[in-house]
């Protein structure tokens, strides 16, 4: 089995696609009007308009209703990203903090309220854990 993507459902596709394009520096592919994909080296971030939910079953997902998932990106320098993103991010949850498991992280909400974590492994153990990934 191969992990292929994570999909965010939104009522405002263009706004959310623009946010993630600015966050990642990657231009989204648009295989269909209500759908976009940002293809990163490790996984694809898919963004679908809420009208696509009916294709999976009415009510199977609700835009902006995520309370249990954090979308995470490993970056080279989380402190530099924090500085870069200050004008893009409206709601910061956590400023740069070194976590007990060895990652230095920032946590914020995207325009739909989804939690996003950017992190850099900073301890020797964390650096070793991510080698080869």
Residue ranges and their predicted role:
Residues 1-4, 26-72, 82-109, 120-133:
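Vicinal oxygen chelate
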